Amino acid sequence: MAKHLFTSESVSEGHPDKIADQISDAVLDAILEQDPKARVACETYVKTGMVLVGGEITTSAWVDIEEITRNTVREIGYVHSDMGFDANSCAVLSAIGKQSPDINQGVDRADPLEQGAGDQGLMFGYATNETDVLMPAPITYAHRLVQRQAEVRKNGSLPWLRPDAKSQVTFQYDDGKIVGIDAVVLSTQHSEDIDQKSLQEAVMEEIIKPVLPTEWLNASTKFFINPTGRFVIGGPMGDCGLTGRKIIVDTYGGMARHGGGAFSGKDPSKVDRSAAYAARYVAKNIVAAGLADRCEIQVSYAIGVAEPTSIMVETFGTEKLPTEQLTLLVREFFDLRPYGLIQMLDLLHPIYKETAAYGHFGREHFPWEKTDKAAVLRDAAGLK
């Protein structure tokens, strides 16, 4: 492989689409806390002064949608009209219905192991050994930049920062290996009382330099900090936000394929979410076991059917044993039926709000990031 560039982007928790994702997952968590078997498909729309929460929810739980919404927006940091959005005064509208019984009859079964998939669809999982968390470097460092932006905003180090921000990092590869960072873009919302030069210097010193490894930076690395020159109007005042609009940010930054289904607001019976988590778990354990340097898993389902309609393993020529054998190992050691993967990853808990900003993958405390199958896979493969 020749030299090439690869770019990934991320957005902060204060980005309008991410506000929507976090509200949807906060509602999901509140319901799962009371009713782990609830069926939840919660969508959120945010715009200046308004939040609309809709979807289909079937549950025995009662939750206060308005309070959950305001608390989520408040935690993100939109607490004053000067920021273009205020948790205390925004309107909160609710349009919640129940899950169709036609769907429900295809999912629920007397035998839990026969629980059908909540919909048809295809999902991908990916892992690579180019970072310690077995994620692609471009998306990993794009996330870390906007996480750092939120950190210095919330701890008061840079009090003129506002919640909305975006990052983008372009890595240089040579023969598939990282050799440097070619370009960094960071745009952050800010108050009126900071000039462009001071902002750029502070962002470089307090956000970019603490995050990006110096060995990947060189004299030709380009930095674009608030390149338009002004970013005062942001958040839902600048753009409307919708749940499920940042699916590449949520996953692998474009380095792997995507089945198209969003995650936030969906309970684990929706394979769009749970099977994508399981596919990451499978791919990560294959790479952690040393069976491949890169691994992409595809699974697919039919609505109401428990067994996956297909499982594919792609290792991009980095495999240490034939992919046919890898596929057999996946089928042997991972239960990818909807109920099986829910049990395997212990998904019926309120753990989802935290996933809704800074990526669903590559953060070690989530259950789908465990590498507890790596040793058994390696033994079964006969590798020393």
From Swiss-Prot:
InterPro entries: ADOMET_SYNTHASE_CS, S-AdoMet_synt_C, S-AdoMet_synt_central, S-AdoMet_synt_N, S-AdoMet_synthetase, S-AdoMet_synthetase_sfam. Belongs to the AdoMet synthase family. L-methionine binds at residues 56, 99, 239, 270. Catalyzes the formation of S-adenosylmethionine (AdoMet) from methionine and ATP. The overall synthetic reaction is composed of two sequential steps, AdoMet formation and the subsequent tripolyphosphate hydrolysis which occurs prior to release of AdoMet from the enzyme. This is S-adenosylmethionine synthase. Its main location: cytoplasm. Pfam families: S-AdoMet_synt_C (PF02773), S-AdoMet_synt_M (PF02772), S-AdoMet_synt_N (PF00438). One of its GO terms (cellular component) is cytoplasm. Mg(2+) binds at residue 17. K(+) binds at residue 43. CDD domains: S-AdoMet_synt. GO terms for molecular function: ATP binding; magnesium ion binding; methionine adenosyltransferase activity. ATP binds at residues 15, 164-166, 230-231, 239, 245-246, 262, 266. Its cofactor is Mg(2+); K(+). Its EC number is 2.5.1.6.
